[in-house]
Amino acid sequence: ESESEVLIMNISDKIKYIGVDDTTLDLFESQYAVPDGVSYNSYVILDDKTAIMDTVDKRGMKDWENNLLNALDGRNADYVIIQHMEPDHAGSLARLIELFPEITVVGNAKTFVMINQFFENINIKNSLTVKEGDTLNLGSHTLTFVMAPMVHWPEVMVTYESSEKVLFSADGFGKFGALSLTENADWACEARRYY
């Protein structure tokens, strides 16, 4: 079990970072040394409709759930956008569906094939399959989906929110390291190792 640190950050008034640091993980994907741990990145957009951008690995699920419920402040979760099926992005999807059974799961065609491979008997009541250039309006925020296969895996997509000009980049532009441990670290050096 992970010792994770709770982090909630305002990206803007309506977009919140609800990810979790995991400072006890030694090897990412059982092969990459991560002496500074990792951060599992997840965001929530609070508009007329709410959208969760990715979930987190099961190791950080309890803290992420607390972050999410705090950020929602009693509101319903309308959408979850699954940009990447790797467990550090989608590992808590089944728990999210338990919490919000009517949530709409948003992904591309490959995402839904992989969901059924990763989760046995997952009960998705509502789903939305998106393709290149499709949009999803949340109110004052509009999400545009851009396919990015093999940024890491074949189903990867990124999501652009046009009103605030925010790119949710899945595994693109990332690096290893828990945010709480690497706040003042040399970003470029670790990013080079990641890529």
Where are the language model's segments positioned?
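Active-site metal-binding motif and surrounding structural segment of the metallo-beta-lactamase
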Residues: 48, 59-106
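Active-site environment of divalent metal-dependent phosphoester hydrolases
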Residues: 85-90, 112-115, 152-153, 174-177
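Conserved beta-strand hairpin/beta-sheet module of binuclear metal-dependent hydrolase folds
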Residues: 8-68, 158-161, 165-169
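Metallo-beta-lactamase
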Residues: 10-13, 107-195
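Short, Lys/Arg-enriched N-terminal segments with co-localized hydrophobic residues
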Residues: 1-8
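Short, flexible loop segments at the rims of nucleotide/cofactor-binding pockets, characterized by
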Residues: 28-33, 56-58, 82-84, 143-149
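Short coil/turn connectors at secondary-structure junctions
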Residues: 48-49, 77, 101-102, 124-125, ...
